[in-house]
Amino acid sequence: MSRKYFGTDGIRGRVGQFPITPDFMLKLGWAAGMAFRKQGHCRVLVGKDTRISGYMFESALEAGLSAAGADVMLLGPMPTPAIAYLTRTFHAEAGIVISASHNPHDDNGIKFFSGSGTKLPDEVELMIEELLDQPMTVVESGKLGKVSRINDAAGRYIEFCKSSVPSSTNFEGLKIVVDCAHGATYKVAPSVFRELGAEVTVLHASPDGLNINENCGSTHIESLQAAVLVGHADLGIAFDGDGDRVLMVDHTGAIVDGDELLYIIGRDLHDRNKLQGGVVGTLMSNLGLELAFKELDIPFVRAKVGDRYVMAELLEREWLLGGENSGHVVCCNHTTTGDAIIAALQVLMALKRKGETLAQARQGVRKCPQVLINVRFEAGKSDPLQNPLVKEASDKATEAMAGRGRVLLRKSGTEPLVRVMVEGDDENQVRGHAEALAKLVAEVCA
């Protein structure tokens, strides 16, 4: 059954445009509360990132959940993975995150976590969608949900992050720059690294509700690169607005992406005989990562793009490590979802054990030239990927690379974009095919 509201990562869109409106969020809170109540007594945690609209939607969700008889525990601004962790430790039926991740402030969205801290099963999402189409009813007054606030949420999560590395860990002498993207990590990330002994310079940790992800964080890494070079830091760490993505910068200012971080963590686990199986990447993972793991005899498989698909593959195979080149890294030996702070800590521990710099560790991945071009299209128009001209051009580009590259065309699960990715061993050829395909897709979308 197809979904009406839920995308690959919850519900997301422009604030004020359906479904990202206060009245829809009220109904969504009620529908979610009714769905979770079917499993017995219902307690739901609600957290958010730092967008100004988060306060409005928090109030609407709170009212809807209460109307359904669900107790609500408010966390305030907290990273998405923190909400997953706290949902689990408070034994709540579900967790709700109000965030649009790496998108600008005028977008927002909703993600759900199950009581075990994982993404909701498909059947629960479909149940919520069915309830959204039913009239809203309010439970009798004596059964209305109560609302409370968890005041020590940040401290609990900081201690959890620190527990992901050995208790003897001391990063004294390590000089790092941390970019919090004016987002949900601003209260917790600097404390985690400082309490473990690192010297920390903090960038973009003054959210005003409007500046989240604005020319900062993992999607705009230039200021972090500059700060690392100017401050002669050992490395830089960039988070996105909700704290589930991480990219790094080495001491030379070079960007270290999710593929390379996955390699560094995977190699460390492999060296210590703690990998448990192989590593899960995605269709967008660079071919160089696959080849690097092959050299280490580490199995590597590709899931569909999206951390929920990476997680599903990990659970099915009972493996521990997976991620995306965008910086979602899932360490199942520590977390139930992508956690940027914990992933960064695993990289720092791997470097410490090996006695390497980040620049040295990343050399294990010889990345193939890869070009990604995003083409915007209007929702409701015919699917450009089903156009025979686009299919023919994609097939011809693949054939022209004669087994030395690959072409991937896909629609984003969170934005109205077609992503055109071409990868191969000849950079000029790769760029030429990518630009030609992107131009054709744009013409078809016009």
Curated annotation (Swiss-Prot):
Q: Enumerate the cofactors the protein uses.
A: Mg(2+)
EC assignment: the record states 5.4.2.10
Cofactor mode of binding and number, as noted: Binds 1 Mg(2+) ion per subunit.
User: Per its UniProt record, what HAMAP family does this chain match?
Assistant: GlmM_B
Which NCBIfam families has this protein been placed in? Answer: glmM, PRK10887.1
InterPro entries, per database record: A-D-PHexomutase_a/b/a-I (IPR005844), A-D-PHexomutase_a/b/a-I/II/III (IPR016055), A-D-PHexomutase_a/b/a-II (IPR005845), A-D-PHexomutase_a/b/a-III (IPR005846), A-D-PHexomutase_C (IPR005843), A-D-PHexomutase_C_sf (IPR036900), A-D-PHexomutase_CS (IPR016066), Alpha-D-phosphohexomutase_SF (IPR005841)
According to the UniProt record, one GO cellular component term is: cytosol
Task: Report the SS bond pairs.
Answer: none
Keyword annotations from UniProtKB, A to Z? Isomerase, Magnesium, Metal-binding, Phosphoprotein
Task: Write down the superkingdom of origin.
Answer: Bacteria
GO molecular function terms noted in the UniProt entry? magnesium ion binding; phosphoglucosamine mutase activity; phosphomannomutase activity
Listed under catalytic activity are:
alpha-D-glucosamine 1-phosphate = D-glucosamine 6-phosphate
Q: What is this protein called?
A: Phosphoglucosamine mutase
Q: Which residues carry this modification: Phosphoserine?
A: 101
Q: How is it modified after translation?
A: Activated by phosphorylation.
Active site residues of this protein: 101
Q: Which gene encodes it?
A: glmM
**Record function comment:** Catalyzes the conversion of glucosamine-6-phosphate to glucosamine-1-phosphate.
Q: Where does Mg(2+) bind?
A: 101, 240, 242, 244
Keyword Magnesium on entry? yes
* Family from the record: Belongs to the phosphohexose mutase family.
Q: Which GO terms describe its biological process?
A: carbohydrate metabolic process; peptidoglycan biosynthetic process; UDP-N-acetylglucosamine biosynthetic process
